[in-house]
């Protein structure tokens, strides 16, 4: 269980932030290979995760390829995952798992060590699904588009 001590919420939360960073890095990799009018430069890499996801969804939609249906679903799943990440990382987590949002009108909730570990694993799995889709579907599609353009 990620080597955490019983009741330790901080170590699993560290894995949430680590896996979220790797997931965002994989999204950056996807955006760097998707065809776009303007290159995916360092300015765009500084965008919020929500903006990156919207941009990636738009670029994938513009390709109009049924081979990318799975990728569309993966990108859609990410919005909820990163919203949960924001709640955990930007909220105030107290002993016993009491989580208070910094947003007005959001109620307090409880999270356990197991909840946080499970969520870290969901982020890791999402990143792996995105990587597989990029390698299996996006790269071959982009390569064939370049070949058609060069012909």
Residues of each region from the PLM?
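Amphipathic alpha-helical interface elements
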Residues: 1-58, 72, 76-83, 87-90, ...
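Short, glycine/alanine-rich amphipathic alpha-helical segment
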Residues: 50-73, 104-121
């Amino acid at each position: 269980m990620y080597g955490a001590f019983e009741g330790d919420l901080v170590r699993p939360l560290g894995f949430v932030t680590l896996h979220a960073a790797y997931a965002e890095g994989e999204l950056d990799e996807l955006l760097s290979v998707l065809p776009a009018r303007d290159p995916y430069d360092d300015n765009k890499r500084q965008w919020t995760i929500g903006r990156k996801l919207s941009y990636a969804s738009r670029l994938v939609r513009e390709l109009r390829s049924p081979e990318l249906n799975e990728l569309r679903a993966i990108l859609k799943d990410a919005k909820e995952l990163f919203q949960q990440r924001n709640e955990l990382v930007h909220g105030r987590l107290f002993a016993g798992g009491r989580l208070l949002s910094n947003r007005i009108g959001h109620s307090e909730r409880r999270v356990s060590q197991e909840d946080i570990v499970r969520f870290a694993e969901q982020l890791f799995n999402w990143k792996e699904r995105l990587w597989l889709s990029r390698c299996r579907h996006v790269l071959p599609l982009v390569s064939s588009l370049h070949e058609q353009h060069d012909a």
